[in-house]
A protein has these predicted regions:
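Class I SAM-dependent methyltransferase Rossmann-like catalytic core
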Residues: 1-44, 56-59
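S-adenosylmethionine/decaboxylated-SAM
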Residues: 7, 41-306
């Protein structure tokens, strides 16, 4: 069992507060964040959450840190990055407002709501509100102990994450990819394939979240290739296949990741303009019960590729 894998048996023992802020991640993922904060992290290096949303994941992680006797609230810092507003260019929901809907005055920022929800942890919480390209420092080389990625919804944002955060990982750093069950984000999957020689997977994904620990220094040329997306379509497909060899289902058995990753391959081809190839990969997956139930719009998009 891996070091992170030792947390899996503890998931059923975690009881989070009933009033934990709204989150788009599952209760299982929130429990795992708590366990990481409680049992694994120290605060000696950076603890970073990219995509804090309404604060549920931040709250669970911060609660674990507060319950951790090793974590020093005077010196340790949890960094929370997000736009903290709804509207064009964001993936935020109005449920992130305390009232569950946008204010009557039409305001788009839920930053004040986030601060109020996280008030118990403000002494060690640093909030970075705005576009990640502006709120992160390209010259920051301080090591990162923990990186929670729930922001890489576009290639442009993922490049920023790769250039400014992945480069700060060291052996022992822990990374969570929250959107790993999203076939439309194949850069998460083939970049993980590129990192496989240097990381240790915690175990099966916790619902949609893949967790891993860096086990060896990641060479600069690998990080550069990941950041610059310097892979051919065939190379990307091979890298995803390498991940498929390591992952079957999520920890509950409910998400068939081999099929999810196969659909991610279809999106690699789709985004490259190889629409016939994309559908040749995706078409046979229509018989998969999980994908046909949860990804109907994906099949429709791939079936109607502009070149078909």
């Amino acid at each position: 069992m891996t070091n992170l894998g030792r947390l899996y048996p503890l998931l059923d023992d975690v009881t989070l507060p009933d009033d934990i802020p709204y989150s788009q991640v599952s209760d299982w993922e929130l429990r795992f964040l708590y366990l990481l904060g409680r049992h694994r992290l120290t605060g000696e290096d950076g603890i970073v959450e990219l995509g804090s949303g309404g604060g549920g994941s931040t709250y669970a992680l911060a609660l674990g840190l507060r319950d951790n006797p090793v974590f020093d609230e005077r010196t340790g810092r949890l960094h929370a990055y997000d736009f903290f507003h709804v509207g064009k260019g964001t993936f935020a929901t109005e449920k992130f407002f305390t009232a569950g809907a946008r204010p009557v005055d039409g305001g788009t920022s839920f930053l004040a709501d986030f601060r109020a929800r996280l008030e118990p942890f403000l002494p060690f919480l640093e909030i970075h509100a705005g576009d990640i390209h502006r709120t992160s420092d390209p010259d920051d080389t301080d090591p990162i102990e923990f990186l929670h990625i729930d922001i890489a919804k576009t290639p442009r944002v993922f490049r920023c994450v790769a250039e400014r955060f992945l480069t700060r990982l060291r052996p022992g750093s822990v990374v969570l990819h929250q959107d790993f069950a999203g076939p439309r984000l194949p850069w998460l999957h083939y970049s993980t394939g590129a990192l496989l020689p240097y990381i240790e997977l915690a175990g099966p994904p916790i619902r949609s979240t893949l967790a891993f620990e860096v086990s060896r220094p990641i060479p600069a040329h690998v990080l550069k290739s990941v950041a610059e997306d310097a892979y051919t379509v065939d190379e990307k497909l091979a890298l995803i296949s390498a991940v498929q060899d390591r992952i079957d289902h999520d920890h509950t058995g409910g998400i068939p990741f081999k099929s999810v990753l196969e659909m991610a391959k279809a999106y690699v081809a789709h985004y490259a303009g190889q629409y016939e190839r994309a559908w040749s990969i995706a078409g046979p997956l229509e018989s998969d019960a999980y994908l046909s139930r949860t990804r109907a719009s994906h099949f429709e998009q791939l079936r109607k590729g502009p070149g078909r």
